Design a protein with these regions (language model features):
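P-loop NTP-binding core
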Residues: 1-265
């Protein structure tokens, strides 16, 4: 039975895609069968692995009932790593989920919409060791779905005071969903501090996050690394865990090891 890891932050630009991709690649390198599910309407993750992702069936078609989820799983160039792509039409799916969620809340009906992602994944749970969800920022309905589906939610946050407000909102919402549920939800959640530097401001921000959220913060932090524009490739831009000669590569390797302990892989 697959473990589900979800990367969420209600604020955009927090590093969800880079986090998702590097965790996925690291676990695949460790020999686990990994499925990366793109739930972001921008399809950034999809575009890195599938050239014509906009014209490729994926999560949108599964949710619309046009495709079976087993038929939209695509292999990648990396051993043990597969992907289900997204596209811009995912926005329509998100809006429909939000409408269902709102309707069920105001009518005080049993909220079935929160099980949407969990239900979609059920037919393939025995095909993979780990399923990783790379999420759209904005929609609370998807975050709620992830709380119901995931074993672990990773909340990436940049070194930025405004970003810290975003992670505070995300964590509070996750706690509200867990405490407000009639079920005993077994969903862990932890903050991942990214794009750290050696500056005093960066160190102070890391200390602030650790002092505020205590044990809800990963020990590992991810170093900021910007490759020169002429050297930037897919690997330097997203898959940094492969280069263990760099600080950021070692950071992602450490994160994967920490996550394995967290979800008992």
């Amino acid at each position: 039975m697959a473990k589900i890891i979800s990367c969420n932050n209600q604020k955009g630009g927090s590093g969800k895609t880079a986090t998702s991709v590097n965790i996925a690649k690291g676990l695949a390198d460790d020999g686990y069968k990994v499925l990366l599910v793109d739930l972001d309407l921008q399809g950034n993750t999809s575009s890195k692995f599938i050239e014509d992702f906009e014209n490729t069936s994926g999560i949108v078609e599964v949710l619309n009932g046009k495709s079976d989820i087993k038929d939209v799983i695509y292999s990648t160039d990396f051993d043990n790593l597969s992907i289900i792509p997204s596209k811009l039409e995912w926005l329509d799916c998100l809006e429909e989920l939000a409408r269902q969620d709102y309707y069920e809340e105001i009518k005080k009906k049993k909220n079935k919409s929160v099980y949407t992602i969990k239900t979609l994944l059920e037919p393939i749970m025995n095909q993979f060791d780990v399923i990783i969800l790379d999420n759209n920022p904005s929609y609370k309905t998807i975050l709620k779905n992830c709380v119901y589906a995931a074993d672990l939610i990773v909340v990436p946050v940049n070194i930025d005071r405004n970003a810290i407000k975003g992670v505070d909102y995300t964590i509070r919402y996750i706690i509200d969903v867990i405490t407000g549920s009639e079920e005993d939800l077994d969903c862990k959640f932890k903050i991942l501090v990214t794009k750290t530097t050696r500056t005093r401001v960066s160190r102070n921000c890391v200390d602030l996050i650790r002092n505020t959220f205590k044990d809800l913060v990963f020990e590992t932090t991810i170093t900021n690394q910007i490759a020169p524009a002429e050297k930037q490739t897919f690997f330097e831009d997203y898959i940094m865990i492969d280069n263990l000669n760099t600080k950021v590569g070692k950071d992602y390797r450490s994160l994967v090891d920490e996550i394995r302990k967290e979800i008992e892989l």
